[in-house]
Swiss-Prot record:
Organism: Vibrio campbellii (strain ATCC BAA-1116)
GO BP terms, alphabetized: ADP-L-glycero-beta-D-manno-heptose biosynthetic process
Oligomer and partners: Homodimer.
Function recorded in the entry: Catalyzes the ADP transfer from ATP to D-glycero-beta-D-manno-heptose 1-phosphate, yielding ADP-D-glycero-beta-D-manno-heptose.
The encoding gene: hldE
Name of the protein this chain belongs to: Bifunctional protein HldE
Enzyme class, broadest EC rank: transferase
Family: In the N-terminal section; belongs to the carbohydrate kinase PfkB family.
NCBIfam families noted in UniProt: cyt_tran_rel, PRK11316.1, rfaE_dom_I, rfaE_dom_II
Length: 476
């Protein structure tokens, strides 16, 4: 199955669970300590990332969804860092601050790509009051279409049954990343995402696919779940539902560097996709593709909507289609080595019309390869105002990539593509409209590198704004 990306901007997701701050210290090791037989790390860099349930929220936001997170923290510096970081990513934070506890923090010391030690700063939350979380749920539920509960057994989900009942009473599906062998506490949830070890901790050793399906169905019946999605590492993932055939997906991972946070990514993409209107099968296929991307990254990682689109459409073949900036730069190098002339243009291309197609055909005729750089949704909104774009980035890029004239489609988030153009440095930069070559973003850089800048005419009578106005006016 090769699913189509949904509009994640329509996906509101509430995340409840164990929030953490992941800290990383990086540096070389060149000697052994004289005090003990351990390496000495000269710390040269550090990094802070939201982890646990906070990483789930960050994944939702990275996809373009609307994340609202509720969790327990201390009243300390890590809680402040978490809140500021998540707010900067447009995640709505609604933490319950408990002064007698520290915010869960994990410090990893890294050298040469290897983790040398992890230090955990935490106390399990116990005998907490459910009401502060329930009241926050009451406020959040009307604006979400899915609830994720991220359980790391740190105590934030001590009252998980009350939270499940609250969400289900509002007809909101509940997706749970479980911890531990007690699935009774998750009774009535919509879907659980245990990994193979977690699954076998509950049902015992599984020796075949058939046995996995039978034991999973027994759990679904016993605990009144709608489904289980068992993630099976190199064996992919299997969706088991009552009254339906099992749905299996092979792994899409090319290389595995770090599985930290992979479960967070699976449940994030799964729930956000369902919230955006996808079926369980389609949502699982998207989650499987996402997992294949993040295990190739180091540390707790998110992925963007663009990376997910590339994973689905096979971005390893960089001859054509939607492509990342780094992959584009490499593809352009290969094209130049073959003596191909690279042409580049840019625009919003919100509603593709005949004028756009004519313009792009003309641009393609001027060289061997045509790159189209596309403004992301936030960039379009800043340039065009409220109500734009009509079509989200992934859909605009998919339509452009389907045109025979276009070789590569790449997004950019700035107001102009000047930085991107200066990285790519095409042989020919073209722009449609009433411009002078020196006024075109990136033109100076292209000319300085020995390239050319040209202005092409748009076909008269074609305008995205006119099309939108006609639709609003009920014409045509």
């Amino acid at each position: 199955m090769k699913p189509i990306l949904p509009d994640y901007n329509s996906a509101g997701v509430l995340i409840i669970g164990d929030v953490m701050l992941d800290r990383y210290w990086y540096g070389p090791t060149g000697r052994i300590s004289p005090e003990a037989p351990v390496p000495v790390v000269k710390v040269e860099n550090n990094e802070e990332r939201p982890g646990g349930a906070a990483n789930v929220a960050m994944n939702i936001a990275s996809l373009g969804g609307h994340a609202h997170i509720v969790g327990l923290t201390g009243m300390d510096e890590p809680a402040k860092v978490l809140t500021e970081t998540l707010n900067s990513l447009k995640v709505k934070c609604d933490f319950v601050a408990l002064p007698e506890y520290p915010t869960i923090t994990k410090l990893r010391v890294m050298s040469r790509g290897q983790q040398l030690i992890r230090l955990d700063f935490e106390d399990k939350f116990e005998n907490t009051d459910a009401e502060p979380v329930l009241s926050r749920m009451e406020t959040a539920l009307p604006s979400v279409k899915a609830v994720i509960m991220s359980d790391y057994a740190k105590g934030s989900l001590e009252h998980v049954q009350a939270y499940i009942q609250k969400a289900r009473a509002a007809n909101i599906p509940v997706f749970i990343d479980p911890k531990g062998a007690d699935f009774e506490r998750y009774r009535g949830a919509t879907l659980l995402t245990p990994n193979m070890k977690e699954f076998e901790d509950v049902v015992g050793k599984v020796k075949s696919d058939q046995e996995l399906v039978e034991k999973a169905l027994a759990l679904v019946e016993e605990f009144e779940f709608e489904a289980l999605l068992v993630t099976r590492s190199e064996n992919g993932m299997t969706l088991i539902r009552r009254g339906q055939e099992p749905f299996h997906l092979p792994t899409q991972a090319k290389e595995v560097y770090d599985v930290t946070g992979a479960g967070d990514t699976v449940i994030s993409v799964l729930a956000a996709s369902v919230a955006a209107g996808k079926s369980f099968e389609e949502a699982c296929a998207l989650a499987n593709a996402a997992a294949g991307v993040v295990v190739g990254k180091l540390g707790t990682s998110t992925l963007s909507e663009i990376e997910l689109a590339e994973a689905i459409h096979g971005s390893q073949d960089t001859d054509y289609g939607v492509i990342s900036e780094q992959a584009l730069i490499e593809a352009v190098k290969k094209a130049r080595a073959k003596g191909e002339k690279v042409v580049m243009t840019n625009g919003c291309f919100d509603i593709l019309h005949a004028g756009h197609v004519s313009y792009l055909n003309h641009a393609a005729e001027l060289g061997d390869r045509l790159i189209v750089a596309v403004n992301t949704d936030e960039s379009v909104k800043r340039l065009k105002g409220p109500g734009r774009p009509v079509n989200p980035t992934d859909r605009r890029m998919a339509v452009l990539a389907g045109l025979g004239a276009v070789d590569w489609v790449v997004p950019f988030s700035e107001d102009t593509p000047q930085r991107l153009i200066s990285e790519v440095l095409p042989s020919l930069l073209v722009k449609g409209g009433d411009y002078k070559p020196e006024e075109i973003a990136g033109g100076k850089e292209v000319i300085a590198a020995g390239g050319e800048v040209r202005v092409l005419n748009f076909e008269d009578g074609c305008s995205t704004s006119e099309i939108i106005n006609a639709i609003k006016g009920g014409k045509g």
